[in-house]
């Protein structure tokens, strides 16, 4: 059995807010699609230093997944969600000794930074 988990590791406020928007979505299947879309469009929203503008760009991606402006704004103001994300980041950093992003963990082994697809595939195939 293969289980994929996404653990946020925000390095700045833009990444934190993108993860907050992701957590606004209740449908797990759609969450991975939204996560993928956020990564694909990252260069279009993770630009500049004006967080209000960045949030509007992140929300454009959320709109594609039928998240309302009201729902996303409510989530962005929810400090519990932010605290949960940041606490998970701290725990993961300690547990897995994460020093760079992305870091992929397969059965407790770290693959950090840019991972060659062939090496990554071999590691997964060995576990299947």
Question: Predicted regions span which residues?
Answer:
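Structural alpha/beta surface segment adjacent to cysteine/selenocysteine redox centers
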Residues: 1-63
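C-terminal cap of thioredoxin/glutaredoxin-like
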Residues: 60-128
